Each structure stands twice: as C-alpha cells, then as structure tokens.
C-alpha cells in the first residue's frame, strides 16, 4: 500500500463526509436564502452559527469528516490570521474576523468524533482590490511571490491548529502550478500536522456550457486523494485507487447534494433540496466504500448552522453504510 493510501485509510474507515461553503458572500448576503435575510459584521455572522448543533446533525447522520471553506475569492477569511493582515494592511475584523470560527468548529466536531479538513484556494483573494494587489494574485498563472505569501497564510493556520486539522482540499489549481510551487503549499499544510491529507483540484476549467477552457495539468505529486469534483455522481472506483503520475492515491468523488437552478446544472453547490433519493444515495455510497473509495457531499447549511431538512433525510440513511 502506498504512503497516500495508508495516510487516507482513516477516511476509508469513516466512509463519507460533507463539504460546507460557509462564505461571507453567501451567509452574510441578505438576498441569499442561507443568510436568513441578515447582513451584519462578519464577526456577528460567524457568531450566529451554532457549531455544536451543526456537529450533532453530522453525528446523527454518521458523517466522518467535514471540509470547511476558509475563504473563496473575497477578502473574508474564517479565522484570525496575522500573516494575512500584515500582507494586506487590513485591521483585525476587516477581513480576518476576531472570532476564531475554525477553533469553535474543531471543538464541536471533536466532541462527536468528526474530522475537520480545510478548503484553501490556489488563486487567493483575487476579487478584493486591496488584497489582490498586496498578494499579487492577478492570474491567470500564479507568480512565485504570490505563492510564497499565500502559503504563509496557510502555514499560520496549520501551525495554530496542529493535528486537529486532518487535511486540506485546495481549489483553483488549474494552470501554471509546477511541482516546486505545489511543494510550498504541501509544506505549509503539513507544518502543523505531518500526517495531514491533501487534495488539489487540478482538473480543467469549464464554462457554464461545458466547454473546456483550460487543459488539466499533470497530477500533484503531494496529493493523497483525488479532488474528485464533478457535477453528476455515479462514477465508481477500481480497487479504491486513482493513479496520477504512476502513483496510487485514494479514489475520492465530490459533488453537491442540492438542486441546481434549471438554467445551470452545475450550480447546485450549497443549494437546498436533494437531487438524489435516500435509497439511491445509500446504494451509491455503499458501492464506493466496498470498492475502497470515499465520498464527500456538498450540503446546504444556513447561517445559524442548520442543515437543509431534505438533505438531512438523505444523509441519515448513510449512517448504516
């Protein structure tokens, strides 16, 4: 068994997990249903989330892990970060909150035996003019100076939380990333936990019509499981491994449980409802596990930490997989 397969064995034993996009532009946007009509400071929004109740719901369903977004494109982070503030010039509370939401989530999930993985990006806070200029995340290809700065932000989080962060799922790694640049992230992710599992989302980027915009780059030599992002579930692993660059890593698939809008079939991330019946999802998750793979489902979670009830009806059946 390869090092990556050994390192991810705990994930196979836990079988499946959830993915949560807890982002300021969603849960603090009064036009979005998940915000419950509220717009406050970022700190107040984070304090509205009941981490214990959220963890209890996952435990009720038997989830093994939760992948939680630290940020996505905007300046707003999920926890304090002195490195980020120093680079950007933002004061505490302006981009990085004063409250440590990640620590709160760790404590709640730890009580029910659920692992926490963090979502990070490869393109940084590129939608915020001040942060974009400070980091140099202009795109489309990353500059070494940006990678050094952005990896330093991840390193601070990794060192703070140590072994409580079981892994990292990194998005936006499509083009321009070399093994040398990827190593900076891998070293940062494992600074606090040498056994942290890693997946980098390197697949080709598609537009809303399904046209390939960029070609996938070769697999990351530091990945332990496949990023697995896909629109429709249904694929199955062969003997639990995905082979990238001749190296076996854990086969993993990730997609959204929610119902997308009719005009955009890939737009179901974080949406309510379920595209799949409980019976279908049970059979699919069971088949993946029997073949050595793992499954992560993106779910709809409100600002207060409550999971969409239709999705909970699906998740509950997975406890017996």
Name each model feature, range by range.
Residues 1-321:
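Mature catalytic domains of secreted/periplasmic carbohydrate-active enzymes
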